[in-house]
């Protein structure tokens, strides 16, 4: 039995309460949640299918199901009297509601579709299809608006459209539509927020906008008074400028009065603000110059705060702001009409195609659960409801859960300090409200339990994290105070290590270096310098030891023990990868960006664009200059000279017309290829066309031979996969595919480069802090800590906020001027604070990943000025004005006993009274760029020396007459013959059917087979009978696409096939060859029933595995070490508790019931499939079947 802490045991045992478990990082929340579920099953005798367990990703749901299954199996091994009950839970586990909120909504909608009149056969729309549908709906809407010529619409276009087009306004409609989907009733919310713009000066004082502005000003004025009090203290020190006291006290009095006026109407505050004046400082010649300057600077900062309020908030009077809002009201109302108009058009397009998107699922679910009878059904069905990662919920998900919970059966677990998904519209205030209002006593109907013990990290790491966040995190910044309840406490014991656990490396960007390499210094990017310094630190780390708990020994650190965490991987990850590779450090970047920037992807997309339309200069020249076109720069110039003004394709046509030379022949051949590919693109599926193009051009193999070839080929396969997804939509053709990809690029939908390494490879991982959430590593290097925060969320023309609504700029069309409305000003402040709060929580996530060591690295400029700011940063206002993570870290460290390096830079004193007792241990280093730059300089000198030797190379010095002793060796090498001639005729890749042919003596037909392309379009083919292979393909296709919850009868299956015909997935002729009765028999067979009852079913799963050629093809030499790729497609496999079951469909005719000979024929194929599946999934294939449709029978291998 596990030894649970008192708090963990309380979370496991508590009943009769809604529980909020505030689980700190590394506190074992998932283990507690699983144990609570097991105890409910054991002690409360409640079946697992009477529980609703909500997670936020499918992967998390799968992991939760596996954990629960493992825990149940572990209990069964104890051989208690509850074994039968536990066995029942194993059987029920597949139908248990362990799910995401979207999957739960799918179940609700499918069960109760009649309540909202939605097609029960709906499917989830692919991102490709829905993106294009949104674009179409928007274009139709705007075309209709232009035809309607409504004056307010044109004013809206003028105010929020671009200078030459209306794209910004279209983007705004999409932005508002997307944003309001996080509200339970989107259009109602939007209408209410638009109504806020119609108000009087009396309403203005009570508006959320003014309350937000006042709250922000309150913090600013407190900051100003703190600065003035510090300035006054310095003025009163011995040697200080006493004559400054009068002016400083005057400022303090006026600002104190201004602060008090915040409780009055905003017009009164505005009057007080405009009456503030600052007295001139009296001369103080005999004062200490340092103290005088310090006191004056502090006062100037305080004056700057007042100036900021005047210049950036109250640029006009409150009455003028009210007038602005009233003028904006009709524009915002028309924006509301555009959004609702778009919503209805988009909804109709989805309905026409029988699809829904994820937002629909949530809102359909809400609409259905608003029905009391349905809500009561779910309240009775679920004895307990569990919500994991509750801090990432939004108000829609909260409303869904609240509608099906009872008064005391909700269990919510999470950590608001790790709420880092604001960009997905997560709302941490839901967690915070409960955190602050729930009681802590046993028996409270709403009860909070804190899990504060951390079982992941060393005490030294925890002490440092606690010190930092106690200093910087607060209710105002971070949205939760870091008090004793939020602090981390060590829960696990660790063996001691020699090296310090927390290290801070500050890289100063502007340290002095030798003049002769100053230019090189400028060329070396800041990111690259940081990456190189970290690379060297990693090499040093490999000489250090950590304690391996699993093997109970000290061991050297390995690459895979180290992770580099970045706030953003864009631009940064690639620089780090290159620096690590240069230093011989194997590395892997887990990034979601950089895909479209990959040269091979950009090049191939240009080829597709040119095939679609040759009159595009940049893509055309790009393709011609590439290995596909093989034109030289000189040839491209010669072509352009023929027509300097037209398109480049015009110049090509004129060159062909005027010239008779080799370049003309080359151009004619190139254009013929483009025309040929253009014709093929019209009648070949886009995914097949892309793959054929990769093979025809040899481009796939070309990039494979480049540095990083495997990665580049994987990137091209992603494009092929994306085309396969596109092909499944109702939108077809090369033009539409290109349009979709461009839309994806324009909407920042970068897919990220392909991933070719696994988690067990011995490499240093480079990932974003977001990706690291939930993970742990022995050593964490938090890099890029000096990078400025990205607060561009506040720069848009119209801001959006869940509480404050719409925040547009005000445009005066008569004066052609604009300014921020008070709504936008309020929102800018609020969004900035919320963004900074999330940045602080992101920092918390990063610093709570390490087990043994945390290394913090950041670059900065003008460190002498920064340390002054850090030393003065002792209030919320200062921390809110931080520009980077280093500003927070530095502000805490400069006051720490180990921050002497920083204090020395500014000659600051240590506040021994306040911070001496602090026991966390930090190592602070200030590094320069000199070493990196000097190393680069020496490297370039060596390269120049090598080039010089090559330039003056003398062939005579290496004449064979002078080196006859090498003649025999040269002859041997030139006359060498390859010892494995068999390897030269073995293909690099074989399908499973090819292997069967090879072993039947048909190798020649495989080696020399040439794929042919039938160029006759389908509409010219005429009618002809389908071959047996084609009939088999159709049946496989139908089995792949059938909705498995609607296969109980011939009627249900026939309806689905008719739908496939309607959507042009198959033709009517193809549908007629499908024997529906045979398919029904399959689903009613023993193996079919098992498949339908399985938790996870996978259909038509392609694979490629590497095998030794001699193990695959009979008769090859035992000495042959050649490898080949085996590819195939597994018809179906499904998961059961104790392994995988593989099923392969066959339409072979069975003579006299002789199924054994059929099995013998396909034995090798099934063996290959099973091996591939085990290698891919890491799970055991326990059973393998052929399903023979001819005799309606499943045959086990």
UniProtKB/Swiss-Prot annotation:
Residue ranges annotated for the UvrD-like helicase ATP-binding domain, each copy included: 2-458
Q: State the CDD domains in the record.
A: DEXQc_UvrD (cd17932)
Q: Which residues cross the membrane?
A: none
Looking at the record, the residues that make up the UvrD-like helicase C-terminal domain are: 485-774
Tell me which domain of life the UniProt entry assigns to the organism this sequence originates from: Bacteria
Under Enzyme Commission nomenclature, its number is: 3.1.-.-, 5.6.2.4
What is one GO biological process annotated to this record? Answer: double-strand break repair via homologous recombination
The reply to whether Zinc-finger figures as a keyword in the UniProt entry is no
Needed cofactors? Mg(2+)
Positions with a binding annotation for ATP:
23-30
Does this entry carry the keyword Methyltransferase?
A: no
Sorted alphabetically, the keyword list is: ATP-binding, DNA damage, DNA repair, DNA-binding, Exonuclease, Helicase, Hydrolase, Isomerase, Nuclease, Nucleotide-binding
Known catalytic reactions: Couples ATP hydrolysis with the unwinding of duplex DNA by translocating in the 3'-5' direction; ATP + H2O = ADP + phosphate + H(+)
InterPro entries per record: AddA (IPR014152), DNA_helicase_UvrD-like_C (IPR014017), DNA_helicase_UvrD/REP (IPR000212), P-loop_NTPase (IPR027417), PDDEXK-like_dom_sf (IPR011604), PDDEXK_AddAB-type (IPR038726), Restrct_endonuc-II-like (IPR011335), UvrD-like_ATP-bd (IPR014016)
Q: Which Pfam families match?
A: PDDEXK_1, UvrD-helicase, UvrD_C
| GO MF entries | 3'-5' DNA helicase activity; 3'-5' exonuclease activity; ATP binding; ATP hydrolysis activity; double-stranded DNA binding
Q: Name one GO cellular component term.
A: DNA helicase complex
Per UniProt, subunit arrangement is: Heterodimer of AddA and AddB/RexB.
Family recorded in the similarity comment: Belongs to the helicase family. AddA subfamily.
Its function? Answer: The heterodimer acts as both an ATP-dependent DNA helicase and an ATP-dependent, dual-direction single-stranded exonuclease. Recognizes the chi site generating a DNA molecule suitable for the initiation of homologous recombination. The AddA nuclease domain is required for chi fragment generation; this subunit has the helicase and 3' -> 5' nuclease activities.
Q: Any idea what this protein is called? A: ATP-dependent helicase/nuclease subunit A
Instruction: Please name the source species.
Output: Alkaliphilus metalliredigens (strain QYMF)
């Amino acid at each position: 039995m596990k030894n649970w802490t008192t708090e963990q045991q309380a979370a496991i045992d508590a009943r009769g309460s809604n529980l909020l478990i505030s689980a700190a990082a590394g506190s074992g929340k998932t283990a507690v949640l699983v144990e609570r579920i097991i105890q409910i099953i054991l002690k409360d005798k409640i079946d697992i299918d009477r529980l609703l367990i909500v997670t936020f990703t499918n992967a998390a749901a799968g992991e939760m199901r596996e954990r629960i299954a493992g825990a149940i199996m572990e209990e069964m091994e104890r051989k208690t009297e509850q074994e039968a009950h536990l066995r029942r839970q194993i059987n029920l586990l597949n139908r248990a509601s362990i799910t995401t909120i979207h999957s739960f909504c799918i179940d609700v909608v499918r069960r109760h579709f009649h309540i909202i009149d939605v097609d029960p056969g709906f499917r989830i729309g692919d991102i490709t299809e829905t993106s294009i549908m949104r674009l179409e709906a928007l274009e139709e809407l705007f075309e209709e608006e232009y035809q309607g010529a409504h004056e307010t619409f044109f004013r809206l276009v003028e105010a929020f459209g671009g200078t030459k087009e209306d794209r910004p306004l279209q983007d705004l409609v999409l932005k508002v539509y997307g944003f309001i989907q996080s509200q339970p009733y989107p259009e109602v919310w939007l209408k209410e927020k638009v109504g806020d713009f119609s108000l009087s000066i009396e309403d203005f004082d009570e508006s959320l906008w003014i309350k937000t502005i006042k709250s922000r000003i309150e913090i600013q004025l407190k900051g100003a008074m703190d600065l003035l009090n510090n300035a006054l203290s310095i003025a009163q020190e011995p040697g200080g400028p006493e004559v400054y006291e009068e002016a400083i006290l005057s400022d303090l009095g006026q600002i104190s009065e201004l602060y008090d006026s915040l409780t009055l109407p905003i017009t009164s505050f505005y009057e007080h603000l405009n009456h503030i004046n600052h007295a001139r400082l009296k001369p103080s010649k005999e004062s200490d110059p340092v103290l005088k300057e310090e006191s004056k600077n502090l006062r100037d900062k305080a004056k700057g705060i007042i100036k900021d309020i005047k210049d950036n908030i109250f640029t006009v009077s409150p009455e003028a702001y009210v007038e602005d809002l009233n003028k904006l009201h009709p524009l915002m109302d028309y924006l509301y009409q555009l959004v609702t108009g778009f919503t209805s058009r988009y909804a109709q397009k989805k309905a026409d195609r029988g699809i829904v998107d994820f937002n629909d699922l949530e809102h359909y679910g809400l609409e259905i659960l608003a029905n009391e009878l349905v809500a009561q059904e779910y309240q009775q069905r679920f004895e307990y409801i569990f919500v994991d990662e509750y801090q990432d919920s939004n108000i829609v998900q909260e409303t869904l859960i609240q509608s099906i919970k009872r008064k005391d059966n909700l269990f919510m677990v999470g950590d608001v300090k790790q709420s880092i998904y604001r960009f997905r519209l997560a709302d941490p205030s839901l967690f915070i409200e409960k955190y602050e209002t729930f009681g802590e006593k046993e028996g409270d109907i709403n009860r909070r339990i804190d899990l504060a013990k951390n079982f992941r990290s060393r005490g030294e790491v925890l002490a440092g994290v606690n010190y930092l966040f106690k200093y910087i995190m607060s209710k105002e910044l971070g949205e939760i105070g870091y008090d004793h309840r939020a602090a981390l406490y060590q829960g696990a014991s660790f063996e001691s290590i020699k090296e310090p656990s927390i290290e801070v490396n500050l890289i100063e960007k502007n340290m002095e270096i030798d003049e002769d390499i100053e230019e090189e210094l400028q060329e070396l990017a800041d990111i690259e310098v940081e990456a190189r310094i970290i690379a060297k630190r990693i090499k040093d780390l490999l000489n250090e030891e950590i304690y391996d708990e699993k093997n109970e020994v000290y061991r050297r650190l390995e690459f895979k023990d180290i992770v580099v965490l970045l706030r953003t991987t864009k631009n940064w990850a690639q620089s780090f990868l290159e620096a690590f590779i240069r230093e011989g450090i194997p590395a892997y970047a887990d990034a979601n960006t950089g895909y479209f920037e990959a040269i091979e992807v950009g090049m191939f997309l240009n080829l597709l664009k040119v095939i679609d339309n040759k009159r595009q200069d940049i893509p055309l020249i790009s393709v011609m200059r590439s290995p596909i076109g093989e034109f030289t720069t000189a040839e491209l110039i010669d072509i352009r000279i023929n027509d300097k003004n037209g398109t480049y394709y015009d110049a090509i046509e004129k060159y062909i017309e005027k010239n008779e030379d080799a370049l003309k022949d080359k151009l004619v051949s190139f254009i013929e290829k483009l025309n040929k590919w253009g014709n093929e693109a019209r009648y070949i599926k886009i995914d097949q066309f892309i793959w054929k193009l990769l093979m025809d051009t040899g481009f796939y193999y070309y990039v494979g031979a480049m540095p990083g070839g495997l990665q580049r080929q994987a990137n091209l396969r992603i494009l092929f996969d994306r085309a396969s997804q596109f092909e499944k939509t109702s939108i077809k053709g090369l033009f539409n595919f290109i349009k979709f990809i461009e839309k994806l690029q324009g909407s920042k939908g970068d897919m990220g480069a392909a991933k070719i390494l696994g988690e067990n490879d011995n490499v240093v991982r480079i990932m974003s802090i977001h990706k690291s959430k939930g993970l742990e590593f022995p050593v964490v290097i938090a890099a890029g800590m000096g990078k400025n925060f990205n607060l561009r969320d506040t720069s848009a023309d119209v801001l959006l906020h869940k509480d404050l609504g719409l925040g547009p700029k005000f445009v005066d069309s008569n004066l052609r001027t604009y300014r921020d409305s008070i709504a936008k000003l309020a929102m800018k402040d609020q969004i900035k604070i919320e963004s900074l709060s999330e940045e602080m929580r992101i920092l918390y996530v990063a610093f709570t990943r390490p087990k043994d060591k945390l290394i913090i690295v950041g670059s900065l400029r003008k460190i002498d000025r920064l340390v002054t700011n850090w030393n003065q940063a002792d209030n919320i206002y200062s921390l809110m004005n931080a520009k980077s993570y280093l500003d927070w870290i530095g502000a805490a460290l400069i006051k720490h006993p180990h921050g002497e390096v920083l204090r020395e830079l500014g000659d600051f004193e240590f506040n021994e009274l306040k911070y001496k007792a602090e026991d966390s241990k930090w190592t602070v280093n200030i590094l320069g760029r000199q070493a990196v730059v000097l190393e680069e300089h020496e490297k370039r000198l060596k390269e120049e020396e090598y080039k010089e030797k090559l330039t003056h190379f003398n062939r005579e010095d290496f004449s064979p007459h002078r080196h006859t002793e090498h003649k025999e060796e040269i002859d041997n090498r030139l006359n060498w013959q390859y010892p494995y001639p068999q390897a030269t005729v073995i293909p690099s890749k074989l399908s499973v059917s090819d292997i069967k042919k090879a072993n039947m003596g048909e190798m020649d037909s495989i080696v020399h087979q040439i794929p042919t392309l039938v160029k006759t379009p389908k509409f010219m083919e005429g009618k002809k009978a389908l071959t047996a292979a084609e009939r088999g393909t159709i049946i496989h296709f139908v089995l792949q696409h059938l909705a498995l919850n609607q296969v109980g009868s011939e009627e249900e299956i026939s309806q689905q096939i008719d739908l496939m015909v309607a959507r042009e997935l198959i033709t009517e002729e193809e549908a007629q060859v499908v024997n529906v009765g045979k398919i029904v028999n399959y689903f009613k067979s023993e193996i079919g029933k098992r498949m339908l009852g399985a938790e996870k079913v996978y259909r038509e799963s392609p694979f490629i595995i590497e095998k030794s050629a001699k193990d695959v093809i009979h008769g090859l030499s035992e000495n042959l070490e050649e490898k080949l790729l085996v590819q195939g497609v597994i018809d179906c496999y499904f998961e059961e508790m104790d392994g995988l079951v593989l099923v392969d469909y066959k339409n072979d005719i069975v003579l006299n019931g002789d199924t054994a000979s059929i099995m013998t024929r396909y034995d090798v194929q099934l063996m290959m499939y099973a091996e591939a599946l085990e290698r891919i999934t890491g799970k055991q294939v326990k059973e393998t079947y052929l399903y023979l449709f001819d005799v309606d029978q499943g045959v086990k291998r």
